[in-house]
Amino acid sequence: MSNCFDTNILSSSHINFLFGAGVNGKAFPQLKSFTDTLSKIEELGGNIESGLESGIDSLSSSAHKKIVKDVFIKEFMEADAKMNEKFGKDMSLINLEKMLRKTYLLVNESQNRNPSMKQINIFTLNYDQIVEKTLSSLGYFFSEISASNTTTRAMLLDVIGYNFNVKKYVPTFMVSKLHGDIDNPIIPGKSKYQEMLNEDYFEIAFNMKEKLCRQNSILIVIGYSGRDEHINKILKDCLNAGLTIYWYKFAQMDIVPFEENTQIIVRQQEDYSNPQDTTANCYRDMEQVWEKKLEE
């Protein structure tokens, strides 16, 4: 499979990522694995035949949804605690680390005179702190914002690090948790679209749209199902404003909204019968770009 990145474009763009649950590979359980939450939905009269999200929607009582939310948070935190044992060992997490490290190197070495291009935005739909822990272990400068800290951290949305010793801006990651975090989550279910309109969440979503609509912006999509109506609306608006999207597919049946749009470059798997982590595929594509830069 040929590299989907153009070397010149990648080295002269605002680089942004959109991460869904699939970015963690097999390192973190998917919603279908939250058996305690699924059992509680059934116990309260919900229907889980179509999965956890539809099961939550099938609950008519807000009190029941609150009970399910509490069970979900407890189960999530238990899974998150086990995650700490996997750092440095799980191949999916290693692939994520390699991809973020290569992104840093590319941005650091790019000869962009625009300081804003030193900011790397990661918009994530996940509650976990895998990205933050990975960036911290790499020693990279980053900020994180979610609905639980918007009031105190909104001022960091445009912060970019500067090294006074060498008088140079340094790559800075901005992690925006679009569905909140485990302290203040938007739990799965159609009601999340209404919650996204709340002030705290709206500010994060608005910032995403603003960043993606900038000139010379690209978005690398990894692990996203393509089924979030609110996110898809943002992507559509940004495509109309000139955004280029690089979409990494894991499974052949993965949904890519607006796939007919020529501004969406879909990175297929080399072998769908043996799919590789999309973070690994992205890393390899970036590695090829890096090698070309070294040859220049």
Tell where the protein language model's regions lie, with residue ranges.
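Metal-dependent phosphodiesterase/nuclease catalytic metal-binding core
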Residues: 196
